[in-house]
Structures are given as structure tokens and as C-alpha cells.
Curated annotation (Swiss-Prot):
Enzyme kind, highest EC tier: transferase
The protein, known as: 2,3,4,5-tetrahydropyridine-2,6-dicarboxylate N-acetyltransferase
E.C. number(s) listed in UniProt: 2.3.1.89
Native species: Bacillus velezensis (strain DSM 23117 / BGSC 10A6 / LMG 26770 / FZB42) (Bacillus amyloliquefaciens subsp. plantarum)
Role played: Catalyzes the transfer of an acetyl group from acetyl-CoA to tetrahydrodipicolinate.
Name of the gene encoding the protein in the UniProt record: dapH
Keyword flag Transcription regulation: no
Amino acid sequence: MKMMDANEIISFIQNSTKSTPVKVYVKGDLEGISFGDSAKTFLNGQSGVVFGEWAEIKSVIEENKDKIEDYVIENDRRNSAIPMLDLKDVKARIEPGAIIRDQVEIGDNAVIMMGASINIGSVIGEGTMIDMNVVLGGRATVGKNCHIGAGSVLAGVIEPPSAKPVVVEDDVVIGANAVVLEGVTIGKGAVVAAGAIVVNDVEPYTVVAGTPAKKIKDIDEKTKGKTEIKQELRQL
């Protein structure tokens, strides 16, 4: 897994073509109307649907207001710099409502649950589950076979570019609603209790809890049983 450099992300955002895509349901005398070079139209007689950039389509609507009887616009972003990740060929289970931006790496057999928000430059390892409403900030990196509990936040760092991102090593379990601050590394096999706020690095194979999180014990057999990762949930 390759972590994206902060300056690469900054350059990507700076140089991207900002986009305000819209979907327009349109009705009227549409014959001969061009909705712009980049638009895709699905017109049938006097009605249809147009996909394209708002700046182009807005001009067309204004110029042809005598021909266009009515229209409805669907729009969910303005001057967006980063598109959503194309999910069609990702070898993972991604449930409805997850928001995953472009330039995110997702390993095979990972699971992304409803409402998760995953920002640019994040890395998710093979077999890792990102539970409901988790937030992975920019460049947050999670290893293999982890479980990030519902509502948890792994803080992101894109600026300042010198800042170190959150790194979660393999086989880590993070409980619900935990917060891991910028620059923290969670060591291999560690467990972070629900609701913990982690401000310092966590040693491998230890359990931390509290606000701020502190070590309460080393991993033992009882803890392993309570935090077992089930591969059956990760099968495609």
C-alpha cells in the first residue's frame, strides 16, 4: 500500500478542473437545441434528461427559454475539486451511502459500511472493515484485517503537508466512536476501546482506553475472543 504524499494531493486539488455537475429533466420544443459539448442528452420528442456542467446548461436554458416549457435540476455539489471513486471494479464490499473520494486505495475483500466518509489519499488494507459512519480523513492509512468501529474518526492531514497522518497497522480493532488524532500510529494487533481519544502512539498488542487513551493491559486470550475478526463477513 502506497501512502499518497500531501503535496501530491495539494497539486491534484489545485490543478483539477472544478466541476458543478447537474442532471436536468427538461420539457419543451427541444429539437435543434444543443446543451453543450460536454453534455450527454437522453431526449425523446419533447422531453428528456440532460447530464452536464451547470455553467453550460444554464446558458442553454436561458438562451432557449421560449422553447423550454419546464425543467427540474438535480445538483449535489458546487465547484467540486475531487470526483468520487469509481467503484464498479473495486474488489470489496461497499454498501449504499458510503462516500469515497477519488485517489483512495481499497484492498481486496475490504468492507465499507453505510455512511462511511473516506477522503482523498486514504488507504484501506485487505480484509479491513470500515463500519457505519466512520470518517477517514485525508491520508489516513489502515492496514490489513482491521475493524474500525462505527462512528470512529481517524483524523486527516493534508495541510500542513509536513504533518504525519494517522497510521493503523494490521490486525487492529478500534471500538465505536473512538477518535485518533493526527500523527498517531496504532501498533499491530492493538485494541482501542470504544469512545477513546487517542493522542499518542499505541504499542503493538496492547489495549488502550479513556480520554486521553492510556494503556490498560496487554492483549490476552480473553481480549482476543472479544475482538475476533470474522473472515466470513469479508467474503465476496
